[in-house]
Regions:
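N-terminal soluble domains immediately following signal/targeting peptides that reside
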Residues: 1-114
């Protein structure tokens, strides 16, 4: 059940993924909200990220690069064509204009589509 929250591997960021409606159904639009916070759990200002969604066969169905969450949050409207479990990857690429560098600050969520 949403929201889901993960900490990146280095622990520099917390990423939350929320969605409405809470039950995702194929063919209907779902609003996903990405929240990025720093290690103290304050909103990360000017956070850039990539949002990648893959189906159960690891085929990329959505690939949104360089998304800007100016106040640490941003929403995306997405419609899934088929039911199944999708993997939502969120890769933080920069915060306050400072690149995250060689380290991949990424989280993954498993999300069911009915």
């Amino acid at each position: 059940t949403p929201p889901l929250k993960e900490r990146t591997a280095r622990g520099d960021f917390y990423v939350s993924l929320d969605w409405k409606p809470a039950i995702i159904t194929a063919g209907n639009e779902t609003t996903f909200t990405v929240d990025i916070a720093d290690k103290d759990q304050f909103p990360a200002s000017q956070a850039s990220y990539d949002l990648i969604i893959m189906d159960s066969n690891n085929t990329i169905i959505t690939d949104l690069k360089n998304q800007l969450a100016s106040e640490g949050t941003k929403s995306h409207n997405i419609t899934f064509e088929k039911p199944g479990v999708v993997t939502v990857k969120i890769k933080v690429t920069s915060v306050k204009g400072i690149d995250t560098g060689i380290f991949t600050e990424q989280v993954e969520f498993q999300v069911p589509v009915k």
